[in-house]
Amino acid sequence: MGHRLVVVLLLALLVAGAARAAEQAAGEDGIRGGAGADHQEAAGITGGLSRRSFPAGFVFGTAASAYQVEGMALKDGRGPSIWDAFVKTPGEIANNATADVTVDEYHRYKEDVNIMKSMGFDAYRFSISWSRIFPTGTGKVNWKGVAYYNRLINYMLKIGITPYANLYHYDLPEALEVQYGGLLNRKIVEAFADYAEFCFKTFGDRVKNWMTFNEPRVVAALGYDDGNFAPGRCTKCTAGNSATEPYIVAHHLILSHASAVQRYRHKYQHIQKGKIGILLDFVWYEGLTNSTADQAAAQRSRDFHVGWFLHPIIYGEYPKSLQVIVKERLPKFTADEVHMVKGSIDYVGINQYTAYYVRDQQPNATTLPSYSSDWHAAPIYERDGVPIGPRANSDWLYIVPWGLYKAVTYVKEKYGNPTMFLSENGMDDPGNVTIAQGVHDTTRVAYYRSYITKLKEAIDDGANCIGYFAWSLLDNFEWKLGYTSRFGLVYVDFRTLRRYPKMSAYWFRDLVSSKN
């Protein structure tokens, strides 16, 4: 028993020492120097990457969303969003967690922006909570919410962090969902454009980079095809229709995006000199075999994923594969809508994390029509017994750096090489790792090094990519996973909300501060 007690005490001292070292490296002034061995190990292993590896003016930043980091969900005049309603359903979120407080960036924004600055980042891609500005979606303004975003934007500019503002990250005001069905109703187009215009008018003198929606495909598919995200609708759910609703919602999202862009271009862009675009997620799909069927399945998967939104925005119509398969269930654009939608971006953000193999899978007589079954394809995560890549904590996230190269190159070749930036990229660890374990995130360092190397290769091969945003600065509320997933460069103790920079934070500091 004596020997065991000594071992336990030694382990406790080691963990406490690691935690103290990490804590000393964080604080209101950001990263203050070293975190002992972790910093030494991170230093000098950027894999030959530096700022000079990328074009002049290339932007490095981090990304987050309002619902995941702000907290103050029920205070200072903010109205509930569909996610506030969704998390109240027992069993929907791991451990029945909520984002009522999350990492409290609402009060700690200076600390977090200081951390970004100390890491050498140029920009912060944040989102504005629609229901914090308009608690019921339209009408009366919540000026306390406006004041918060003014404080955040002004502080970022004060210390040299460029704001990239996203107008919608999954968090529709619940009042609009209750009033007329939210995104299923065409009224949402004008409501969103009104909200967007208020933001342009209020913040556009300082914000010069706008995004309308983050991952509209996720909004439509997970919210209305399988019901895993708010508002939780699907054919097998309490309410919904997986065969039609995802396409209706996507159509309204595209029109909402284009309507907001139209207002910005007609009324504000020539004065404010800003740019506007949209953020699209893109898993790379690789045919399982070289068979014609599997290669066609891979192309359909790309069409139903990124093409669902980017094809209309670039070419004014849905991909041919969607038109052929979905038929009358796919809404159509009028001539005026085509004119509004086509070309409605100054740039596009690509959120890229992973890649899958796919094989052809044609529906049979028992297959229920749905967005997911319309792909006529099945994702496969290994080939000949070999996984496509190591898996992170999330069951959907495999580490496949070559997928990023192929995704960026595909956007370049398929869509006329639009100006783009990598608007999200990262991996997660389990939520229950200790501080000492969490800050020693060697797998995340290797992930970023390999993915950013592939991004550089794509740029060297001609992709017009102007920036990169890591997801995310902080561990935070990860939607269905609650606090059981950690994507941050900075470890957050969810009990005390203290921030502890991880090895990956020092790695990024070495990368973006290096001029060689």
Curated annotation (Swiss-Prot):
Protein's name according to its UniProt entry: Beta-glucosidase 1
Annotated PANTHER family: BETA-GLUCOSIDASE 1, GLYCOSYL HYDROLASE
Positions in coiled-coil regions: none
InterPro entries, A to Z: Glyco_hydro_1, Glycoside_hydrolase_SF
Organism ancestry: Eukaryota, Viridiplantae, Streptophyta, Embryophyta, Tracheophyta
One Gene Ontology term of the molecular function aspect: beta-D-fucosidase activity
Record's catalysed reaction(s): Hydrolysis of terminal, non-reducing beta-D-glucosyl residues with release of beta-D-glucose
Binding residues for a beta-D-glucoside: Q68, H169, N214, E215, Y353, E424, W471, E478, W479, F487
Keyword Glycoprotein listed: yes
EC number from the UniProt entry: 3.2.1.21
